[in-house]
Curated annotation (Swiss-Prot):
The keyword Ribonucleoprotein applies. Part of the 50S ribosomal subunit; part of the 5S rRNA/L5/L18/L25 subcomplex. Contacts the 5S rRNA and the P site tRNA. Forms a bridge to the 30S subunit in the 70S ribosome. This is Large ribosomal subunit protein uL5. The lineage of its organism: Bacteria, Pseudomonadati, Pseudomonadota, Alphaproteobacteria, Rickettsiales. It comes from the Bacteria. It comes from Rickettsia felis (strain ATCC VR-1525 / URRWXCal2).
Amino acid sequence: MLRFKELYQQKIIENLQKEFSYKSKHEIPQIKKIVINMGVGEAIADSKVINNAVNDLTLISGQKPVVTLARKSIATFKLRESMKIGCKVTLRKDRMYDFLERLVIVALPRVKEFRGFSYKSFDGKGNFTFGLKEQIVFPEINYDKIDTIRGMDITIVTSAKTDKESKFLLSGFNLPFYN
């Protein structure tokens, strides 16, 4: 099932070595982890909403997420310190490659009017962050059973030193880029 892990080991490492001519195999960039974050602002008014977000993220990632808490109170938003305001999950190793494969092959083609990712989404240190507006692009989510459509932020953390190396690495996994 882990075709993306095999793809990395058999082809992407070789292509990176040819392109950047690393001296050691430990210099070759790899994906360290994928962090999926779902902020749930509605949880301030209704604390049960956070359970639905946790269930959605569990189905999407295959791993139980951690509930995130507010760090400080903000009176304008009626937010108190340590209120539940979201959830996140960190994927590593096999689950990370499994999620990346489902994201590229199944979920991204289902996003409406999706042309690809901008190169501006890199942070300068080789990490790539993007957002999805709907959780229903994943086939694990049943449209009839969700309470509301929620978005999520996905961060792909790599060991690449530069954005150029990271772009080359992620392009090897067929992540669509434009520009």
